[in-house]
């Protein structure tokens, strides 16, 4: 007998249908100002939050690096001023009708320490127990706790251990809130399928979708070096377009990836098949699913191809009952353009997402 989704996450998942990632605000801060009040006050302003709501999103994924809190305090005594700022942001988002995924989003060295050190693991679990206690007063119908972005932990068994311990302590500190759990590594569909069967029923399970990197991350400097040679790749896959690119690409790995892209014939029907294992896994375990990262790097991707990809992915996720959160609001995958305090919607992206704002 196939289990049914627990009524609490089933209900709450309905406020996670269409969202946007608030990146580079409280995590992955590239500004020279760093994690300072000046950066926090400038990068996302009240006008931005109002704009997100006006565009038609129902939630945001609020990415938060835990390192600044731990450097200014300890796992058991987090800095009161920093926590107060986070709580204030959540209040403002709620006031604009937006649900909030509180996403712990550290840098790679922090995640490496979780892989290697049992002391770091214990500190992280303590951090979540204390942090969840601070957040326990936030409306549980509209506030979700995501344990760790793209864990990249050495060994799936260790990640299952870390995530399981975090769920236990969050549940002690915030018994009513819904938790977002994800697979290891970059939290893609194959990693979702490796997760332990759920024990705590008030959990929504999550994956990220950037396949194939040859298209979504073409020209991105942090991607594998071969991705610098896939600039201009179009979507849906077109053999003639790929042939033109191959004529000017000499990196052997890039040539392999371009040929794979052509042969896979990436298109909406292919993505429906690609999603099928995740959909089946969710039904098998009786859990709600979200995809809280997907997107296309803007700088080198052909505009119409990027719009077509965003439209196909968001539509397919919605049609299959999977809530989605696009990456990102105002970074290099953006739905909004312009500088601090003067941002405006990219209307074509908004419409590609099926929104009317």
Stretches found by the model and what they are:
Residues 31, 215-219, 328, 336-337:
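Short conserved micro-motifs at the rims of enzyme active sites and ligand-binding pockets
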Residues 37, 221-223, 304-307:
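Short, surface-exposed loop/helix-turn segments at secondary-structure junctions
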Residues 100-102, 289, 324:
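Hydrophobic beta-strand scaffold residues
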Residues 42-46, 272-275, 307-310:
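Structural motif corresponding to alpha-helix initiation and N-cap regions
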Residues 2-10, 16, 118, 122-267, ...:
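Active-site region of glycoside hydrolase catalytic domains
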Residues 299-357:
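Aromatic-rich peripheral "rim/lid" segments of glycoside hydrolase catalytic domains that contact
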Residues 5-7, 11-178, 183-191, 202, ...:
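Active-site mouth of glycoside hydrolases
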Residues 36-37, 41, 231-232, 267, ...:
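Gly/Pro-rich active-site loop or hairpin
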């Amino acid at each position: 007998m196939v289990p049914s989704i627990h009524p609490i996450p089933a209900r709450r998942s309905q406020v996670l249908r269409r969202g946007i990632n608030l990146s580079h605000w409280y995590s992955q801060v590239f500004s020279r100002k760093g994690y300072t009040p000046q950066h926090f006050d400038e990068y996302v302003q009240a006008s931005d939050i109002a704009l997100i709501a006006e565009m038609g999103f129902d939630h945001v994924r609020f990415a938060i690096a835990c390192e600044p809190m731990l450097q200014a305090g300890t796992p058991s005594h987090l800095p009161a001023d920093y926590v107060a700022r986070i709580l204030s942001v959540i209040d403002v988002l709620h006031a604009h009708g937006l649900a909030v995924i509180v996403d712990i989003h550290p840098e790679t060295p922090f995640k490496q320490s979780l892989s290697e050190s049992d002391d770091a693991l214990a500190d992280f679990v303590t951090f979540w127990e204390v942090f969840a206690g601070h957040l326990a007063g936030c409306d549980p119908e509209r506030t979700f706790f995501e344990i760790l972005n793209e864990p990249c932990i050495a060994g799936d068994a260790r990640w299952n251990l870390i995530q399981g311990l975090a769920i236990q302590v969050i549940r002690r500190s915030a018994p009513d809130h819904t938790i977002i759990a994800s697979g290891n590594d970059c939290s893609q569909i194959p990693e979702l399928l490796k997760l332990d069967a759920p024990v705590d029923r008030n959990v929504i399970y999550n994956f990220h979708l950037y396949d194939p990197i040859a298209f979504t991350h073409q020209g991105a400097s942090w991607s594998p070096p071969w991705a610098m040679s896939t600039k201009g790749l179009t979507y849906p896959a077109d053999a003639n377009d790929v042939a033109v690119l191959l004529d000017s690409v000499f990196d052997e790995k890039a040539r392999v990836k371009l040929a794979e892209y052509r042969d896979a014939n990436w298109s909406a029907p292919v993505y429906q098949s690609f999603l099928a294992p995740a959909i089946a896994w969710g039904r098998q375990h009786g859990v709600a699913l979200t995809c809280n990262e997907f997107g296309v790097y803007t700088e080198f991707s052909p505009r119409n191809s990027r719009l077509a990809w965003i439209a196909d992915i968001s539509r397919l996720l919605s049609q299959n009952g999977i809530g989605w959160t696009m990456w990102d609001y105002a970074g290099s995958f953006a739905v909004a353009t312009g500088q601090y305090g003067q941002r405006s919607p990219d209307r074509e992206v908004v419409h590609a997402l099926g929104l009317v704002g």
